[in-house]
Amino acid sequence: LGWNYILLMAAFGTGWLLLLNFFVFREPSRPQSQKNLVQVFADMLLVLKDYKFILTIVIYSGFWILYFQMYDSVLWFLKERIDMTPVNNAVNSFLTIFVDNPSWRFDAEHVTVVNAGTIILLQLIVSAILKNAKPLQTMIVGISFGTLGLGLLAISTYAWVFILGLVIFTIGEMTAHPKFISYIGLIAPQDKKALYLGYSFLYGVIGSGIGGVLGAFAYVKFVTNMNRPELFWLMFCGIGVLTIIGLILFNRFVLKGSKPS
Protein backbone atom coordinates (compact mmCIF):
# COMPACT_ATOMS: atom_id res chain seq x y z
CA LEU A 1 0.00 0.00 0.00
CA GLY A 2 1.16 3.53 -0.71
CA TRP A 3 1.43 6.47 1.66
CA ASN A 4 -1.77 7.92 0.19
CA TYR A 5 -3.76 5.21 1.99
CA ILE A 6 -2.21 6.19 5.32
CA LEU A 7 -3.12 9.82 4.75
CA LEU A 8 -6.65 8.87 3.69
CA MET A 9 -7.05 6.78 6.85
CA ALA A 10 -5.82 9.70 8.97
CA ALA A 11 -8.26 12.04 7.20
CA PHE A 12 -11.12 9.59 7.76
CA GLY A 13 -10.30 9.27 11.45
CA THR A 14 -10.12 13.03 11.91
CA GLY A 15 -13.33 13.57 9.96
CA TRP A 16 -15.13 10.95 12.02
CA LEU A 17 -14.14 12.74 15.23
CA LEU A 18 -15.34 16.01 13.74
CA LEU A 19 -18.75 14.50 13.03
CA LEU A 20 -18.94 13.17 16.59
CA ASN A 21 -18.08 16.63 17.88
CA PHE A 22 -20.80 18.29 15.81
CA PHE A 23 -23.66 15.82 16.34
CA VAL A 24 -22.97 13.92 19.57
CA PHE A 25 -20.84 15.98 21.93
CA ARG A 26 -22.50 18.67 24.03
CA GLU A 27 -20.42 21.26 25.84
CA PRO A 28 -21.21 21.07 29.59
CA SER A 29 -22.47 24.25 31.16
CA ARG A 30 -19.92 26.11 33.25
CA PRO A 31 -19.54 29.59 34.72
CA GLN A 32 -18.28 32.15 32.25
CA SER A 33 -14.69 33.19 32.91
CA GLN A 34 -14.38 36.64 34.42
CA LYS A 35 -10.73 37.03 33.46
CA ASN A 36 -9.79 39.53 30.80
CA LEU A 37 -6.73 39.34 28.57
CA VAL A 38 -4.63 41.39 30.99
CA GLN A 39 -5.36 38.96 33.82
CA VAL A 40 -4.49 36.01 31.60
CA PHE A 41 -1.07 37.50 30.82
CA ALA A 42 -0.61 38.37 34.50
CA ASP A 43 -1.15 34.72 35.41
CA MET A 44 1.32 33.68 32.73
CA LEU A 45 3.97 36.00 34.15
CA LEU A 46 3.23 34.69 37.64
CA VAL A 47 4.05 31.17 36.51
CA LEU A 48 7.12 32.14 34.49
CA LYS A 49 8.53 34.07 37.47
CA ASP A 50 8.38 30.97 39.67
CA TYR A 51 11.98 29.86 39.24
CA LYS A 52 11.43 26.59 41.09
CA PHE A 53 8.70 25.58 38.67
CA ILE A 54 10.65 26.68 35.59
CA LEU A 55 13.77 24.87 36.83
CA THR A 56 11.71 21.70 37.30
CA ILE A 57 10.49 21.94 33.71
CA VAL A 58 13.98 22.61 32.33
CA ILE A 59 15.51 19.66 34.18
CA TYR A 60 12.71 17.25 33.27
CA SER A 61 12.96 18.34 29.63
CA GLY A 62 16.22 16.40 29.53
CA PHE A 63 14.24 13.17 29.57
CA TRP A 64 12.08 14.39 26.72
CA ILE A 65 15.14 15.10 24.63
CA LEU A 66 15.69 11.34 24.91
CA TYR A 67 12.03 10.60 24.26
CA PHE A 68 11.86 12.44 20.97
CA GLN A 69 14.69 10.33 19.58
CA MET A 70 12.05 7.61 19.26
CA TYR A 71 10.51 9.56 16.40
CA ASP A 72 13.76 10.55 14.69
CA SER A 73 17.10 8.96 15.50
CA VAL A 74 15.79 5.52 16.45
CA LEU A 75 13.99 5.25 13.10
CA TRP A 76 17.09 6.25 11.12
CA PHE A 77 19.19 3.85 13.19
CA LEU A 78 16.75 1.02 12.50
CA LYS A 79 16.74 1.60 8.74
CA GLU A 80 20.52 1.96 8.43
CA ARG A 81 22.06 -0.21 11.13
CA ILE A 82 19.71 -2.91 12.41
CA ASP A 83 19.15 -6.25 10.69
CA MET A 84 15.69 -7.28 11.89
CA THR A 85 15.85 -10.74 10.27
CA PRO A 86 15.70 -12.64 13.62
CA VAL A 87 12.52 -10.77 14.61
CA ASN A 88 11.02 -11.16 11.15
CA ASN A 89 11.69 -14.90 11.18
CA ALA A 90 10.17 -15.33 14.63
CA VAL A 91 7.01 -13.40 13.75
CA ASN A 92 6.60 -15.11 10.38
CA SER A 93 7.08 -18.49 12.03
CA PHE A 94 4.17 -17.66 14.33
CA LEU A 95 2.05 -16.32 11.46
CA THR A 96 2.36 -19.63 9.58
CA ILE A 97 -0.25 -20.92 12.02
CA PHE A 98 -2.78 -18.65 10.32
CA VAL A 99 -1.50 -18.00 6.76
CA ASP A 100 0.76 -19.64 4.21
CA ASN A 101 4.15 -18.12 3.42
CA PRO A 102 3.83 -14.89 5.46
CA SER A 103 6.24 -12.10 4.57
CA TRP A 104 5.91 -9.72 7.51
CA ARG A 105 8.82 -7.30 8.09
CA PHE A 106 9.63 -5.10 11.07
CA ASP A 107 9.82 -1.55 9.76
CA ALA A 108 9.99 1.99 11.12
CA GLU A 109 6.28 2.20 11.95
CA HIS A 110 6.60 -0.80 14.26
CA VAL A 111 8.80 1.20 16.65
CA THR A 112 5.67 3.13 17.60
CA VAL A 113 3.75 -0.15 17.83
CA VAL A 114 6.29 -1.51 20.33
CA ASN A 115 6.06 1.72 22.35
CA ALA A 116 2.26 1.85 22.38
CA GLY A 117 1.88 -1.91 22.83
CA THR A 118 4.15 -1.93 25.87
CA ILE A 119 2.11 0.87 27.44
CA ILE A 120 -1.19 -0.91 26.73
CA LEU A 121 0.08 -4.17 28.23
CA LEU A 122 1.97 -2.84 31.25
CA GLN A 123 0.67 0.61 32.24
CA LEU A 124 -1.97 -0.67 34.68
CA ILE A 125 0.56 -3.01 36.29
CA VAL A 126 3.22 -0.30 36.57
CA SER A 127 0.69 2.20 37.94
CA ALA A 128 -0.52 -0.30 40.56
CA ILE A 129 3.03 -0.99 41.71
CA LEU A 130 3.94 2.70 41.93
CA LYS A 131 0.67 4.20 43.17
CA ASN A 132 2.06 4.91 46.66
CA ALA A 133 5.63 5.72 45.60
CA LYS A 134 7.04 9.20 46.05
CA PRO A 135 6.98 11.25 42.83
CA LEU A 136 10.59 12.41 42.69
CA GLN A 137 12.13 9.04 43.44
CA THR A 138 9.80 7.40 40.91
CA MET A 139 10.74 9.94 38.25
CA ILE A 140 14.41 9.17 38.84
CA VAL A 141 13.77 5.43 38.51
CA GLY A 142 11.79 5.99 35.32
CA ILE A 143 14.44 8.19 33.74
CA SER A 144 17.03 5.58 34.73
CA PHE A 145 15.07 2.95 32.81
CA GLY A 146 14.81 5.27 29.82
CA THR A 147 18.55 5.90 29.90
CA LEU A 148 19.24 2.17 30.16
CA GLY A 149 16.98 1.52 27.17
CA LEU A 150 18.98 3.85 24.96
CA GLY A 151 22.18 2.47 26.44
CA LEU A 152 21.33 -0.95 25.02
CA LEU A 153 21.34 0.57 21.55
CA ALA A 154 24.91 1.71 22.21
CA ILE A 155 26.22 -1.76 23.04
CA SER A 156 24.55 -3.92 20.39
CA THR A 157 22.81 -3.76 17.01
CA TYR A 158 21.26 -7.22 17.43
CA ALA A 159 17.55 -7.15 16.58
CA TRP A 160 16.24 -8.52 19.88
CA VAL A 161 18.48 -6.17 21.87
CA PHE A 162 16.99 -3.31 19.85
CA ILE A 163 13.45 -4.46 20.76
CA LEU A 164 14.45 -4.88 24.41
CA GLY A 165 15.87 -1.35 24.44
CA LEU A 166 12.58 0.04 23.12
CA VAL A 167 10.58 -1.86 25.74
CA ILE A 168 12.81 -0.77 28.63
CA PHE A 169 12.70 2.84 27.47
CA THR A 170 8.91 2.68 27.31
CA ILE A 171 8.73 1.27 30.84
CA GLY A 172 10.81 4.26 31.92
CA GLU A 173 8.43 6.59 30.13
CA MET A 174 5.31 5.14 31.78
CA THR A 175 7.07 5.19 35.15
CA ALA A 176 8.39 8.75 35.07
CA HIS A 177 5.75 10.80 33.32
CA PRO A 178 2.61 10.18 35.44
CA LYS A 179 4.63 10.95 38.55
CA PHE A 180 5.92 14.15 36.96
CA ILE A 181 2.32 15.36 36.70
CA SER A 182 1.83 14.41 40.35
CA TYR A 183 5.05 16.22 41.30
CA ILE A 184 3.89 19.44 39.64
CA GLY A 185 0.67 19.19 41.62
CA LEU A 186 2.70 18.95 44.83
CA ILE A 187 4.98 21.94 44.24
CA ALA A 188 2.29 24.21 42.73
CA PRO A 189 0.47 26.75 44.96
CA GLN A 190 -2.84 25.38 46.20
CA ASP A 191 -4.95 27.89 44.25
CA LYS A 192 -2.85 27.71 41.05
CA LYS A 193 -2.59 23.97 40.43
CA ALA A 194 -4.54 23.97 37.15
CA LEU A 195 -2.51 26.91 35.86
CA TYR A 196 0.80 25.26 36.72
CA LEU A 197 -0.25 21.92 35.24
CA GLY A 198 -1.14 23.69 32.00
CA TYR A 199 2.27 25.33 31.71
CA SER A 200 4.04 22.14 32.78
CA PHE A 201 3.69 20.92 29.17
CA LEU A 202 6.51 23.27 28.24
CA TYR A 203 8.73 20.21 28.73
CA GLY A 204 7.46 18.99 25.35
CA VAL A 205 8.33 22.26 23.64
CA ILE A 206 11.86 22.20 25.03
CA GLY A 207 12.35 18.46 24.54
CA SER A 208 11.16 18.36 20.95
CA GLY A 209 12.91 21.59 19.99
CA ILE A 210 16.30 20.55 21.34
CA GLY A 211 15.90 16.82 20.76
CA GLY A 212 15.09 17.11 17.08
CA VAL A 213 17.93 19.46 16.22
CA LEU A 214 20.50 17.80 18.48
CA GLY A 215 19.53 14.32 17.32
CA ALA A 216 19.86 15.19 13.63
CA PHE A 217 23.18 17.01 14.06
CA ALA A 218 24.72 14.33 16.30
CA TYR A 219 23.47 11.48 14.10
CA VAL A 220 25.22 12.89 11.05
CA LYS A 221 28.39 13.56 13.04
CA PHE A 222 28.72 10.32 15.03
CA VAL A 223 26.83 7.73 12.98
CA THR A 224 27.08 8.85 9.36
CA ASN A 225 30.48 10.56 9.30
CA MET A 226 32.42 8.86 12.11
CA ASN A 227 30.71 5.45 11.98
CA ARG A 228 30.56 5.46 15.79
CA PRO A 229 26.88 4.93 16.67
CA GLU A 230 27.78 3.94 20.21
CA LEU A 231 29.03 7.48 20.86
CA PHE A 232 25.73 8.85 19.61
CA TRP A 233 23.65 6.81 22.04
CA LEU A 234 26.09 7.30 24.91
CA MET A 235 25.70 11.06 24.43
CA PHE A 236 21.97 10.73 25.05
CA CYS A 237 22.61 8.41 27.98
CA GLY A 238 24.75 11.22 29.39
CA ILE A 239 21.80 13.60 29.04
CA GLY A 240 19.68 11.09 30.96
CA VAL A 241 22.27 10.86 33.74
CA LEU A 242 22.52 14.66 33.94
CA THR A 243 18.72 14.84 34.21
CA ILE A 244 18.77 12.42 37.14
CA ILE A 245 21.55 14.37 38.86
CA GLY A 246 19.66 17.61 38.21
CA LEU A 247 16.50 16.29 39.89
CA ILE A 248 18.47 15.05 42.90
CA LEU A 249 20.26 18.39 43.33
CA PHE A 250 17.03 20.31 42.76
CA ASN A 251 15.28 18.38 45.52
CA ARG A 252 18.29 18.60 47.84
CA PHE A 253 19.12 22.29 47.54
CA VAL A 254 16.28 24.19 45.84
CA LEU A 255 13.28 22.55 47.50
CA LYS A 256 15.06 22.09 50.83
CA GLY A 257 12.82 23.47 53.53
CA SER A 258 9.88 23.98 51.18
CA LYS A 259 6.56 22.44 52.11
CA PRO A 260 4.66 20.86 49.22
CA SER A 261 1.10 22.06 48.83
Task: Annotate the PLM regions.
Residues 105, 188-203, 227-229:
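Loop-to-transmembrane helix entry/capping segments in MFS-fold secondary transporters
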Residues 174-189:
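Intracellular juxtamembrane helix-capping segments at the cytosolic ends
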Residues 144-157:
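C-terminal ends and interior cores of transmembrane alpha-helices
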Residues 16-28, 231-261:
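Multi-pass alpha-helical transporter architecture, strongest
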Residues 51-105:
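Extracytoplasmic gate region of multi-pass secondary transporters
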